[in-house]
């Protein structure tokens, strides 16, 4: 299987399956001298891990990460950083009934068609369990970006089903299980999720991720444009079916006079572009949105085929998230941070001596 790595100078390679022995990753390109401990990574892993609220899967994984290499005396050495998380709460028997049946809306059918076989236990490599390692690697990127470049990456749930969540207060995002920035929507979210769970159904969501403090100049036209790489990274997250940068698809209804981000001596008058112009960061906040589909692992019967080509009805058993978007916030942050650090290092390597002719606001 190819496609397990992302990045050029800052490069992340993950391995492992949902019900395998462990998950792991190799992080290459971390400059030496960055103070780094397990606790630095655990903060974001705890934000992503399952079983933390009634609104997420009840699979209980501690997700305790181990740093195997690349750190000595509490600082990075510049060599490859090896990370490992052991799986401890697998219930493979929950999936024994689907080993010969293709769950609709899942990767079962496509993996079998591509490889001729599949690990049916929790989806194997296609499971979102893999994203734990992205979050661990992303925590390294987030720390370096903040310490060395003053860049901060953070995200929030901006919509769950029909309920929109406006950015009212960043400070409350980490105080509720939805990562919602609007306190007036918490009761509605709770009521909606309770009804959804009773129904045995699932729902989609929208997550917004923002990077502040990004300098102008990141991005490598034409094929490694910053927005192109961000879209690629965010689209690689399980269940993501759409990515928007800035105003995204809303620009279809805008006129040029409305969409252009005019420039004055005080700076940009707006940020419809989401902080990227011509594939290069403008110095404004980078803003991206992702749309996540509702999981097909629900307790309502649906039609599918088995390996013999026979039509069957099936109900997915096991422990699943009724809304995968809730736990996607730290994953989206991680993917944006990985891309930004890769481009920051590339910019420093090629254009580190360039003096911008204009000030950055």
From Swiss-Prot:
Cofactor section: FMNH2
Q: Which organism is it from?
A: Proteus mirabilis (strain HI4320)
Q: Name one GO biological process term.
A: chorismate biosynthetic process
What gene, per UniProt, encodes this protein?
aroC
What SUPFAM superfamilies does the database record attribute to this sequence? Chorismate synthase, AroC
Q: What is its EC number?
A: 4.2.3.5
Name by which UniProt lists this protein:
Chorismate synthase
Q: Which UniProt keywords apply?
A: Amino-acid biosynthesis, Aromatic amino acid biosynthesis, FAD, Flavoprotein, FMN, Lyase, NADP
Subunit composition? Answer: Homotetramer.
Question: What is catalysed by this protein?
Answer: 5-O-(1-carboxyvinyl)-3-phosphoshikimate = chorismate + phosphate
Q: What HAMAP family has UniProt attached to this entry?
A: Chorismate_synth
The answer on whether this UniProt entry bears the keyword Transmembrane helix reads no
Q: How is the cofactor bound?
A: Reduced FMN (FMNH(2)).
Q: Where does NADP(+) bind?
A: 48, 54
């Amino acid at each position: 299987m190819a496609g397990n790595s992302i990045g050029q100078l800052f490069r992340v390679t993950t391995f492992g399956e949902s019900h395998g022995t462990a998950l792991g990753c190799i992080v290459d390109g971390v400059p030496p001298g960055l103070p780094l401990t397990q606790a630095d990574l655990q903060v974001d892993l705890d934000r992503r891990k399952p079983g933390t609220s009634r609104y997420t899967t009840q699979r209980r994984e501690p997700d305790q990460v181990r740093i195997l290499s690349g750190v000595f005396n509490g600082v990075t050495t510049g060599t490859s950083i090896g990370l490992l998380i052991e799986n401890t709460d697998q219930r493979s028997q929950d999936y024994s009934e689907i080993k010969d049946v293709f769950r609709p809306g899942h990767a079962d059918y496509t993996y079998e068609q591509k490889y001729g076989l599949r690990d049916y236990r929790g989806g194997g490599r296609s499971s979102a369990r893999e994203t734990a390692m992205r979050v661990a690697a992303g925590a390294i990127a987030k720390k370096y970006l903040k310490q060395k470049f003053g860049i901060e990456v953070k995200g929030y749930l901006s919509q769950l089903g029909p309920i929109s969540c406006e950015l009212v207060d960043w400070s409350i995002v980490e105080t509720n299980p939805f990562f919602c920035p609007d306190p007036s929507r918490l009761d509605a979210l709770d009521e909606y999720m309770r009804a959804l769970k009773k129904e045995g159904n699932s729902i989609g969501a929208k997550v917004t991720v923002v990077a502040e403090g990004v300098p102008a100049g990141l991005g490598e036209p034409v094929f490694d444009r910053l927005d192109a790489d961000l879209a690629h990274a965010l689209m690689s997250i399980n269940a993501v079916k759409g990515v928007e940068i800035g105003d995204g698809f809303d620009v279809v209804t805008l006129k040029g006079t409305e969409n252009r981000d005019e420039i004055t001596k005080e700076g940009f008058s707006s940020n419809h572009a989401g902080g990227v112009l011509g594939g290069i960061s403008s110095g404004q906040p980078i803003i991206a949105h992702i749309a996540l589909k509702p999981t097909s692992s629900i307790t309502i019967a649906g039609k599918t085929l088995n390996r013999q080509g026979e039509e069957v009805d099936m109900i997915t058993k096991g422990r699943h998230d009724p809304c995968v978007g809730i736990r996607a916030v730290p994953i989206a942050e991680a993917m944006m941070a990985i891309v930004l650090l890769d481009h920051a290092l590339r910019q420093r390597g090629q254009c580190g001596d360039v003096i911008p002719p204009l000030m950055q606001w």
